[in-house]
C-alpha cells in the first residue's frame, strides 16, 4: 500500500472515529458553555430557588453525560490510534524501505538498557519497533516511554514541596526517547560509551579524553579498552555525534554505547512519534518529518561502517 492510499484510508477512519465520539471536545465545550451561561444568569438576575434546583439537576446530568462521553472518546482514540499505526505508520516506514518491518510494540529490553549504564534504571516500555537491514547492517529502532513513578499523598506542605521537587527531578532524569541498536560482524573486546554531557547521564568513573576538543566538550567517554575506543571513535564518527548534538530538533542529547558486539544510540526526546491524534488534522507533511527522523537515525550507520572498516584493518 502506498503512503497516499494509507493517508486516504486513515483520514476516513479518523472521521468515523470522531463520529463515534459523538462530536467530541467541541460538543463538550458547547455544553459546558451553556451551563456556565445559565449559572451566570442565576447569579446576575437572582432567579430564585426553582431555577437553582433546575441548575443543580442540569449540573448532575452534565456530569453524568461528560463521564460517559469521556469513555466514548477514549475508546474512539484507541481505535483510531491502532488503525493509524497498523495502516499509516506501516506505509510510512515501507516507503523508506519496503523490506523494513514495523510493530507497534517491542524494542530494547530492560536488561540491555540497564547494561549500557548511560541513564539511571527506570521502568519503561518500548514501542514503534522498526527492524531491517540498512547498508548491510542489521538494525532495530524503537521508542522508550518511561512509566510514571508513584508518589505518596501528603498533607504536610514541606513534605509536599519535597515530593514536588522529586517529581520534577524524576521527569528530567528518566530517559524518554529513541534507541537505535545495530549488529555488526565484529567482536568488541571491551565496552565503550560516549555520554552526552547532561545532568541526567552517567558522570562517575574514569573518563577518557580524545583528540577532538569539541567532542570532549560535548561528551564524556568511559571505556574498558582505551585502544579499542580510539579505533571505534574515529574523527568522522565523533563529528557525526557532534552534529547530532548540535541539532535543534526533537532528537537531543545523543549518547552511544559499544558493548556485547552491538552498537546502541540513545537520543533523548519528549516527543512521542508515530501517534494518531484523533482531534488533530492528519498532516502528510508531519509524516514526512517522521520519515526524516528515521533516516536521520539510520545515517549514523554510514559513519559507523567506515569506523569499523578502519578497525578491521
Where are these regions (language model features)?
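Transmembrane-cytosolic junction motif
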Residues: 61-88
